[in-house]
């Protein structure tokens, strides 16, 4: 069973909500999945206000008809202490390209110059060698078929460095709620699927970091989105160090059916390696989609929203505590922590803060 808690700001209140109806697959999972999304709206007291559910299905490359229901639970948590409210989500487009000029890499990507068999590491993309996909995060076509090598007709999705997000996805997305993203392979060469930008990676808002105060390294695994939604995009925070968290600029980033989306991270126990943790996990493994805690991060209308979210796949507390702390001179509305297996605020539903100026840290201690 898979948690899908992709966050998107909704309506005119400071509420984090996720419209995630995504096919998920990787090279270990070539099957047909019926993805069931259950979105829960939660008020400041932790009470569920509105439940909803939708489904989407797609066929895998090998044509197997093994149907798996993947329950998706989304926390929508009101920032009770927020002094401002978020504006209504845009519904004018199903996809929005990033307009930021901040990028990482060695320059602009040139269409048709790199073979599909070569991973474009020099362009800012980060190779994920442990997945066995030639460095790619996922390889999918518009029909939901997957492959283990980048080939004609497929979108080859990739990871970026911590604090950055990929820029490539086609404006035309599957009508059934799945998403695809990455460079497009055509006639053996790689092409941009989003020609509005020449870079492969774009910097996020820069308003959050992960700070590790425990003795072991922590593998934080972002979801491959738009794309497979597998939790394979790594941010590894060594003991006593920090790394930027990609806070998606929602107003200019990918939109799912006209709704803003933000970043989602699965956090493994301290000491779990990136190769063992940033994968599609198995039931009871405690890694990947079975990791003990999930983080959310997004920026819209001048406000950063940061969340600590329970993973319904894993009720066990992690081997660390975590809290969201304002940096010096910053303003954070609300309090959010997960200490000794207990969330602050309403208790078991997770918590959200709004950063109205400056930045904040996810502190692991």
UniProtKB/Swiss-Prot annotation:
It is a peripheral membrane protein. It is found in: Mitochondrion outer membrane; Secreted, Cell wall. Keywords: Autophagy, Carbohydrate metabolism, Cell cycle, Cell division, Cell wall, Cell wall biogenesis/degradation, Glycosidase, Hydrolase, Membrane, Mitochondrion, Mitochondrion outer membrane, Polysaccharide degradation, Secreted, Septation, Signal, Stress response. GO terms for molecular function: hydrolase activity, acting on glycosyl bonds. GO terms for biological process: autophagy of mitochondrion; division septum assembly; fungal-type cell wall biogenesis; fungal-type cell wall organization; polysaccharide catabolic process. Its EC number is 3.2.1.-. The keyword Signal applies. Residues 1-17 form the signal peptide. InterPro entries: Beta-Glucosidase_SUN (IPR051526), SUN (IPR005556). Coiled coil: none annotated. PANTHER family: BETA-GLUCOSIDASE-LIKE PROTEIN NCA3, MITOCHONDRIAL-RELATED (PTHR31316:SF2). Involved in aging, oxidative stress response, and in the regulation of mitochondrial biogenesis. Inactivation of UTH1 increases life span, leads to higher resistance to heat stress and against hydrogen peroxide, and increases sensitivity to the superoxide radical-generating drug paraquat and to copper. Also required for the selective autophagic degradation of mitochondria (mitophagy) in response to nitrogen starvation. Involved in the remodeling of the cell wall during the various phases of yeast culture development and under various environmental conditions and plays a role in septation. Belongs to the SUN family. This is Probable secreted beta-glucosidase UTH1. It comes from Saccharomyces cerevisiae (strain ATCC 204508 / S288c). The gene is UTH1.
């Amino acid at each position: 069973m898979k948690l899908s808690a992709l966050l998107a700001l909704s309506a005119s209140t400071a509420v984090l909500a996720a419209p995630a109806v995504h096919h998920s697959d990787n090279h270990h999972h070539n099957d047909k999945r019926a993805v069931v999304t259950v979105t829960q709206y939660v008020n400041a007291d932790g009470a569920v206000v509105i439940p909803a559910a939708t489904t989407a299905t797609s066929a895998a490359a090998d044509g197997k008809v093994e149907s798996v229901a993947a329950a998706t639970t989304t926390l929508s948590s009101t920032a009770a202490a927020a002094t401002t409210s978020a504006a209504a989500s845009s519904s004018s487009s199903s996809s929005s390209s990033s307009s930021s000029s901040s990028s990482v890499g060695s320059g602009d990507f040139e269409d048709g110059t790199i073979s599909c068999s070569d991973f474009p590491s020099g362009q800012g993309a980060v190779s994920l060698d442990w997945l066995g996909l030639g460095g790619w995060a996922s390889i999918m076509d518009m029909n939901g078929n997957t492959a283990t090598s980048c080939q004609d007709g497929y979108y080859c999705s990739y990871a970026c460095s911590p604090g950055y997000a990929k820029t490539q996805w086609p404006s035309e997305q599957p009508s059934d709620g799945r998403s695809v993203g990455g460079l497009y392979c055509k006639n053996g060469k790689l092409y941009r699927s989003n020609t509005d930008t020449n870079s492969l990676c774009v910097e996020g808002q820069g308003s959050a970091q992960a700070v590790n105060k425990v003795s072991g390294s922590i593998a934080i695994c972002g979801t491959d989105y738009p794309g497979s939604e597998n939790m394979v995009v790594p941010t590894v925070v060594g003991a006593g160090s920090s790394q930027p968290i990609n806070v998606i600029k929602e107003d200019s980033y990918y939109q799912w059916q006209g709704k803003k989306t933000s970043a989602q991270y699965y956090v493994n126990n301290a000491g779990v390696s990136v190769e063992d943790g940033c994968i599609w996990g198995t039931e009871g493994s405690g890694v990947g989609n079975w990791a003990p805690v999930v983080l959310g991060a997004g920026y819209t209308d001048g406000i950063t929203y940061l969340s600590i979210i329970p993973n319904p796949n894993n009720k066990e507390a992690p081997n660390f505590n975590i809290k969201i702390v304002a940096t010096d001179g910053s303003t954070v509305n609300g309090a959010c922590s997960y200490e000794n297996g207990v969330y602050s605020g309403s208790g078991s539903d997770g918590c959200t803060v709004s950063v109205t100026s400056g930045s904040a840290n996810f502190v692991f201690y």
